Amino acid sequence: MTIRTQLAGLLLIAGTLLPLNLRAAQTTPTALDKSIDLSVGDHVKVHQILTQLQQAVAQHNAAGVAVLVHYPIKVNPGKKPFTIKNEKEFIKDYDRIITHDIADAIFKQKYETLFVNSQGAMIGDGEVWITGFCRDKSCKQSDIKIGTIQDTKNLEP
């Protein structure tokens, strides 16, 4: 048996085993997943929002980011905070809101290293927070959206 044949056999075996391992990893909730489920509501949705946010920011897709946000939202991308009432305003002010530093924090964030507490899942050093929001008073229906966007370099301790 040649090295090429042995290598091909190993690749074939690895190819059949890898999807099983990936499926097991995706269905087995981690401690982080459980923490997100308790604090925010649904770790799968948080992971989706993080991925969608990263893709939309990479494409400079203001509308793609705007649909992920809970309104109204108070944003603080610099020295003076302001309130965005809806998606239309967000799209108009996108370049003021998603600054280079905020975009950089979004790009660098890995799902596995999210910080989670009762406020939600934190991206970067708090530049963006993904949070659960009740749709009604009984909170039987909820949404998971971006609830905070801020430049943490300008925040006072």
Language-model region placement:
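Bacterial N-terminal signal peptides
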Residues: 9-19
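Bacterial N-terminal signal peptides that target proteins for export
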Residues: 1-10
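C-terminal-biased regions
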Residues: 25-55, 66-157
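Sec/Tat signal peptide C-region and signal peptidase I cleavage site
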Residues: 20-24
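Charged, alpha-helical scaffolding/interaction elements associated with membrane systems
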Residues: 58-59
